Amino acid sequence: MCGGRGTRLATDAEKPLFRVGGVPMVDRVVGALRDSAVDRIVAAPSPNAPNTRSHLDVPCIETPGEGYVADLDAALADDRLSRPVLTVAADLPLLNGEVVDRVLDSHEGGSLTVLVPASLKRGLGVSDDTTFEDGGRVVAPTGVNVVGDGPDDAWLTRDRRVAVNVNTIADARVAEQWL
């Protein structure tokens, strides 16, 4: 998923192309997927990120750029994808193949949402704009999911590699400390 506007990032660069540690975030995510057991990578840019589409060297499914959920729905409706589908946000510069493989190993069918404790995000010093209660804990989605057919499940981890989403310049500084 690489079509966001990145308004909270407050930069001229398209969010997926924003450099963390000198490398565009989307390149870091594609690299993590290539280093994992994922067998096919398809990007989902939008009109909000035209330079991202031309930058990528993987097949793309154009999305409408109307927000994460609408873009995800558009991507999943494309005939080139079949479920289950691993979805990953382009703003996870610490992601690596090992973490991706752990997510895949945790998927037991249906859909899987990867969550982190909101307290972990706060402890790391990164933004936690979206939180909710799950099983008596306040958690935050990571931007990593498996979308399948069947029951929904959640996987809670304390792994900073999925906890650090870059939404602000301050988040980028935190990410760079862990590279």
What are these regions (language model features)?
Residues 1-13:
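N-terminal nucleotide-binding beta1-loop-alpha1 segment
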Residues 2-3, 44-45, 89, 115-116:
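Short beta-strand/turn micro-motifs composed of small residues
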Residues 15-29:
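Short catalytic helix/loop segments, enriched in acidic residues and glycine
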Residues 25-89, 133-134:
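Conserved N-terminal catalytic core of the sugar/cofactor nucleotidyltransferase
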